[in-house]
């Protein structure tokens, strides 16, 4: 696992996000200090997690594993690298929900007032971006599945 992020890694990440309509638009994918990536023996990216500060904790806002490498525990490896006092993740993916539970995350209903304010601002901006880029397929998918997204949170003692 590495924090090194090449242009090819970014291209791979965007291609993964293109097919995962639950995630933010691939045009918003970027290199970040908070990103973690797993590469195979040939240095090809096979899994990625992005973490964003949400004022009242950190959000796992995308976690992707290449379909050819699923079932190998890569999401567990990524989750073990996510650090912070308060970490949360919204997902409707049952495999990720299972991995989150195994990593000590618990189902919650509310991320906190400051985190909610931050999420309201950022999700509104992402929605506006999807409108501007005419990403109606992603908008439709996310609105249709909105009630199915579940919040998981882990609070680490300091």
Which ranges hold each PLM region?
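Conserved active-site tyrosine of GNAT-family acetyltransferases
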Residues: 100, 105
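Extended, charge-rich low-complexity interaction segments
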Residues: 137-147
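Short amphipathic alpha-helix that is part of the acyltransferase structural core
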Residues: 1-26, 39, 126, 145-158
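A conserved beta-strand-loop-helix scaffold within acyl/acetyltransferase catalytic domains
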Residues: 18-67
């Amino acid at each position: 696992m590495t924090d090194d992020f090449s242009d090819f890694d970014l291209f791979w990440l965007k291609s993964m996000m293109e097919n995962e309509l639950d995630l933010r638009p691939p045009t918003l994918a970027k290199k970040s200090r908070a990103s973690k990536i797993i590469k195979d023996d040939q240095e090809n990216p096979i899994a990625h997690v992005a973490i964003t500060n949400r004022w009242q904790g950190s959000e796992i806002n995308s976690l992707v594993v290449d379909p050819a490498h699923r079932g190998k525990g890569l999401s567990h490896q990524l989750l073990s690298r996510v650090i912070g006092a308060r970490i949360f993740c919204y997902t409707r993916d049952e495999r990720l929900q299972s991995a989150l539970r195994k990593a000590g995350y618990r189902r919650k209903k509310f991320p906190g007032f400051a985190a909610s304010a931050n999420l309201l601002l950022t999700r509104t901006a992402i929605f506006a971006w999807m409108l501007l880029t005419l990403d109606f397929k992603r908008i439709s998918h996310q609105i249709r599945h909105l009630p199915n997204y579940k919040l998981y949170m882990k609070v680490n003692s300091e």
